[in-house]
C-alpha cells in the first residue's frame, strides 16, 4: 500500500539509474496484496519502462515472502533489496557498487543516525538486535536492515536454503561471504505511514530466534 509514493519512488530510481549509466539495471517491484492503487501504478510504469518488472501477490503474504520473491526474480549480477518509502537512500547505491567492484560480495548499509525515527521505534529496534544477538549463536549486525548489495553468488546461495518460514536478516548473516559496509543517516519518510509497527518487530525478533 505505497500508492502515495510509487511515482516519486520511480522518479528517484530512474534518476539514480541514469546517474549510474555505466550499469544496466532492472527494477523488480513486488506488490504484496496492496489494497490501494499501487499495483495499477506499477503496471502503468512497467508498460512505459521495460526495466520495471512487477510481481503481483494474490494476497498479503508479508515482508519476508515479498522480499524473497523479489530477490528470486532478480536476474542481475548483484541484487539490492530496498523499500519503496525511500528512507534507505538510493543515492547510496553508487557507493555500494564501488565496494562491490572492489571485491566485496556483500555490502551492508549501516545506519549511524536514527534521529528521524520515533523514540519508540528506536527503542524497539535496539531491543530487537540485543534480544536476537543475546539468544542466538548467529549474530546479526546492529542498525543494518535489509538494504544491502548482494553478489549473484550470495543470491544463489540464499536460493538454495530450504527454509520456508524465512527470517531474511538471519539468512543473510548465515550465508556469510566477503563483506564491506557503507554508513548513512536514514531519511524521514516523505509520504504515507510505516506499515511495520513495534509489535510486529517484536514478533519478528521472536520468530527469528
Model-derived regions, located:
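Acidic helix N-cap motif at the loop->helix transition within catalytic regions
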Residues: 4-8, 36-45
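A conserved acidic beta->alpha catalytic loop
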Residues: 31-40, 86-87
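Short, well-formed alpha-helical segments that are part of the catalytic scaffolds
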Residues: 2-18
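Acceptor/aglycone-binding surface of glycosyltransferases and processive sugar-polymer synthases
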Residues: 44, 51, 55-59, 63-73, ...
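Short helix-capping segments at alpha-helix termini
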Residues: 17-23, 46-51
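Short beta-strand/loop segment that forms part of the nucleotide-sugar
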Residues: 10, 21-33, 55-56
Amino acid at each position: 500500500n505505497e500508492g502515495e509514493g510509487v511515482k516519486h519512488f520511480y522518479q528517484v530510481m530512474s534518476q539514480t539509474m541514469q546517474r549510474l549509466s555505466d550499469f544496466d539495471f532492472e527494477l523488480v517491484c513486488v506488490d504484496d496484496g496492496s489494497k490501494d492503487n499501487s499495483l495499477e501504478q506499477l503496471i502503468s510504469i512497467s508498460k512505459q519502462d521495460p526495466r520495471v518488472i512487477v510481481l503481483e501477490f494474490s494476497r498479503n503474504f508479508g515482508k519476508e515472502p515479498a522480499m524473497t520473491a523479489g530477490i528470486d526474480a532478480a536476474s542481475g549480477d548483484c541484487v539490492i533489496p530496498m523499500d519503496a518509502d525511500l528512507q534507505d537512500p538510493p543515492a547510496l547505491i553508487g557507493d555500494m557498487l564501488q565496494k562491490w567492484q572492489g571485491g566485496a560480495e556483500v555490502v551492508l548499509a549501516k545506519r549511524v543516525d536514527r534521529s528521524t525515527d520515533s523514540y519508540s521505534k528506536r527503542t524497539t529496534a535496539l531491543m530487537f538486535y540485543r534480544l536476537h544477538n543475546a539468544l542466538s549463536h548467529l549474530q546479526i549486525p546492529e542498525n543494518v536492515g535489509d538494504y544491502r548489495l548482494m553478489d549473484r553468488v550470495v543470491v544463489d546461495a540464499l536460493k538454495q536454503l530450504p527454509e520456508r518460514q524465512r527470517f531474511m536478516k538471519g539468512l543473510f548473516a548465515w550465508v556469510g561471504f566477503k563483506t564491506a559496509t557503507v554508513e548513512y543517516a536514514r531519511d524521514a519518510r516523505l509520504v504515507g505511514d510505516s506499515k511495520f509497527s513495534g509489535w510486529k518487530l517484536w514478533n519478528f525478533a521472536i520468530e527469528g530466534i
